[in-house]
Swiss-Prot record:
Function: Part of a complex that catalyzes the formation of methyl-coenzyme M and tetrahydromethanopterin from coenzyme M and methyl-tetrahydromethanopterin. This is an energy-conserving, sodium-ion translocating step. MtrH catalyzes the transfer of the methyl group from methyl-tetrahydromethanopterin to the corrinoid prosthetic group of MtrA.
Subunit structure: The complex is composed of 8 subunits; MtrA, MtrB, MtrC, MtrD, MtrE, MtrF, MtrG and MtrH.
Organism whose genome encodes this protein: Methanococcus maripaludis (strain C5 / ATCC BAA-1333)
An example Gene Ontology molecular-function term: tetrahydromethanopterin S-methyltransferase activity
Catalysed reaction equations from the record: 5-methyl-5,6,7,8-tetrahydromethanopterin + coenzyme M + 2 Na(+)(in) = 5,6,7,8-tetrahydromethanopterin + methyl-coenzyme M + 2 Na(+)(out)
Enzyme class: translocase
EC number annotated for this UniProt entry: 7.2.1.4
Protein name: Tetrahydromethanopterin S-methyltransferase subunit H
Gene expressing this chain: mtrH
Pfam family, one: MtrH
Amino acid sequence: MFRFDKEQMVIEFAGAKFGGQPGEYPTALSGTIFYARHKIVEDAKKGIFDKKAAEALINKQAEMQDITGNSAFVQVFGGTEEALVNYIDFVSEVWDGPMLLDSTSGKARMAAANRATEAGYAKQCVYNSINVAAEDEEIENLTNSDVEASIVLCFDPMDPSVGGKLNVLNDGGKTKDIGMLELAEKAGIKYPLIDVAVTPMGNGAGHAVRASFAVKAKLGLPVGSGIHNVPSAWDWLREFRKGLREEGKDQISKDVHHVCDIGANIVQTMASGDYVLYGPIDNAELAFPAVAMTDMIIAETAKEMGTATVAEHPLNKLI
C-alpha cells in the first residue's frame, strides 16, 4: 500500500465522513433505489412505489452501515421531474444521510435540486452530476440552489486517457472551455466527489482505475465510480451466462454476475477509491462485507506507513 504526498481532502456532511489517505477512512457505499425496472416501482413516470418495501431497503443499507462502519448513501434515480421529486421527498423522511439526486433528465435533476432547497433538505443531497454535457441553465439552477455536494465527472469524450481525465477537471480538456472543478466551484459546490468515469471493458476501463490514483496524487480530492457497470456491459460475460442458462445452470449464471458485479467494487476500493456507487440497493448485504473486507486489508498495510485508522472503521469493528 502507499501514502500520497499530496494532502488529501476529507469530506464530512450529512453524517458521512470519507476521503483522506488510503486506510484512514472506510469507503462510502451508495446503493441505487427506484432504478429502471426496480420491482418496488409501480409507476415510473409518476413516481408511485411500494413505500414499505422502499423503507425496508433503505433501513437494511443503514443497518449494514452500522455493522461495518462504511458510510451509506442512497442514490435516488427518477426518470421524470414528478417521479424524482416524489422519490426524494420520501427518502428525506426515512433517511437523514447523504442521498444522490440522479436522473438521465436534466429537467428532473433541476426540479430535484429546487425541491430539496424549498423543503430544507438540500444539505444532505449530492447532485449527479457536473459534467461536460451540462447545460448553462442546469448549472445556473444548481448555483441558485442550496445543494453543496456534487459528483464531478472527469470524462472527456474527445480524450478518454488518464491525461484527458485530469485535463477536463482542470481546464475543460478538448471539449469544454472551463474546467469541471472551476464549474463546480462557480455552482457553489463545497464538496466535489470526483467520478473517474469507468467505460466498458476494452474501451478504457483501466484508464479510469489509473485515474483514481492520478486524481488523488495530483489534486488530493476524493474519488470513486460506478464501476459495477463494467460487468453489465461485458459482452463475453453476457454470452457466458447465456451458455450456462442453456445448460440448465440458472443459479450459477446468476452467481457469476453477482461475483463480477460486487467484485468490481473491490477493484475501485483497491485503487484508492473513497466511495463506490455499487448499484442496486438490494445488494447492500453483498457489497458492504466485500468492501469492508477490502478496507480492512488496506488499513492494516497503511498502518505501517503511519496512517491512523478512524475508530469507526471495519478494521476496528469486525475483528
